[in-house]
Amino acid sequence: MTKYKYFFGSDFRSIPYLTTINNSEEAITVVTTKPVRSGRGKKLVINPVEEFCKSNNIEFKYFSQDAVYSNMDIGISASFAKIFSTKFLKSNNSIFNIHLSLLPELRGPSPVE
């Protein structure tokens, strides 16, 4: 039976977890954030996870709070730049978050920097 895994990540700290999960034999769908305009020239910049997916031929989707991943058996979130809404979590159960620091001492948006 195929298990459908979703990985939610958006920065360089996500990539080691994505690499490990991607090395398994099961299907994986990567969900990441859309490119943003940044810098003086307001150039469109893609995040490291999208870059990694493109260079390794891994299929990815852009995140939407309204999406329902009805075939998801398990979701893993690591260093993802979005906060899941309650509605999203209720529609898409079985999402686990990998927190990169000790809680509650090192909480916040950038606890390990």
Region roles according to the model:
Residues M1-E113:
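One-carbon transfer enzymes
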